[in-house]
Amino acid sequence: MRPTTEVPDTKRVIIIDALNMFLRSYTVIPSMNPQGLPNGGTIGFIKSLQKLCRDFRPHEVVICWDGHGGSEKRRQMNKNYKAGRRPVRFNRRMIDLPDDVVKKNRTDQQLRLHEYLNSMPVIQLMIDYVEADDIIAHVVKHKKYSDWTKISISSDKDFFQLLGDDSIWIWRPIQKLLLNGTMLLYNEGIHPNNYALARAIDGDKSDNLQGVPRIGMKTIKTNLPILVQENAISCDELFVHCRMQVKQKNVHKKLLEYQERVKGNYKIMQLYEPNISF
């Protein structure tokens, strides 16, 4: 039976992955300012924020940005982290705008958006050398919101690992999908407490992290039922499980062969809670 996803009628805070939401509008909305430069990122973000507030009726809004050098910590773990990413492009035709103008325009739109948001009743968080993902992980677990319903706004699957707490939800705007831990387990066959480990096996192309060859999420779901359980499984426990199989399948052999890759990915994919106050 498919679980229902009805957000509890309690105090609510929505926590927004700001760059994720900005880029969706920036690449799609063709709006231009009087000088003939794009301003769709700024306009689209504000409109999206208005709609989120209408739909979820939050008591507070927290907007989280990547800090300067936010990826540095993970890049020290793996130099290939986020390497080779293509520049963000408009998915529509622009009228002869040079790359340097487009890059400056994107920065200008974000700075303008910061200013607009500073005049609104929202909280903005941005910390040098900390990624927005980690700030969001901190906010949803902050004691201030212990009795609140927390709704994270992002299309990023990294946040699935937070859904082990029943008070945390995720709204995926592109998919128009509202998820909690029960729904994730139903859809993916993997418990939120073990989702980061499953992703470490699968890899993440968007962050340039290679997984175990020929082992995707479907194979993981079918052959590693240990990841369905609520108890968080460590990498070492997973490898012990693979060794103990009387009849080892290819998936078990591959995991043992690529142990170090899985461990490295897992360290990067885990969300860390920075020591911040707000």
Regions found by a protein language model. Give the residues of each.
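Noncatalytic, basic helical substrate-engagement surface that gates or grips nucleic-acid strands
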Residues: 4-151, 159-178, 270, 275-278
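Non-catalytic nucleic-acid-binding/docking modules located in mid-to-C-terminal regions
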Residues: 4-10, 55-65, 80-94, 120-124, ...
